[in-house]
């Protein structure tokens, strides 16, 4: 099967105007446990790497390889860890939006592309549906976010082995839900999420 690549990189229009583009994406909006990770990347104008694409379509090995390459090649990047407490306080959408806004304000750039997330910022921007498939910068952000979050969940798996975090990454798989029903929730579960809220009285 032919590898998918960001052939029609959304950045080109802005690179042709000599504008530096920041791409932002996140990993971990749907899980019941663990943090949300948001990452932004700014590349040199005209940057090319056909291997960089939506993190969900890449193998774990490939994502790990690209994780280091992206950080080496990027003009700048930022990775933010949004805790379970922040998610419960603001809700997942607002927590994601806040983190993306902070990255957009932190990194020097002329234009911002997010993966389907509008931001109230003083920079030109576009909220691009399936941005990680259309923009190399957003795709790079998705890879940094995904690898970072997967590593965190593997660490938590060592602390809470019965939940299968190394494999399910906190998503509501059968094993994970059954473990919640049997052992209760942990300190890293998102208490505002339905299946977790129901079992709050039982803490691992």
List the predicted regions and their residue ranges.
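RNase H-like, Mg2+-dependent phosphodiesterase core
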Residues: 1-204
